[in-house]
Amino acid sequence: MARTDKVGTHKTAIYQSDGYTVAQSHDTQIVRFNTDEIILNSGGWQTKTTKSRMNKVSDAFQLGFRVSQRQGEWFVDYFANEIGDTYSFNDGMILERYKEVNYA
């Protein structure tokens, strides 16, 4: 069953679907993630609000990404295992989540 949580000053639905945790704003699943990957999607709404909600989801679930805008273009800064990378934003982009290495 879906639960609606506040992300920022507006309600964003947070729920489980097909093995993913999903953050949905209006009709768009803006962030989907599981233990292996994070999928970002603006639904074509590259607005300050969408960007802010994505970043608040990242902060709330400690996903390690930050969406920013430079000269009108969106970028994603992704930090995993203390390694930072910057990517051009594309709807449906997938960030691979890094696994911790366990030594016996």
Briefly describe each language-model feature range.
Residues M1-A104:
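Terminal leader/tail segments of proteins
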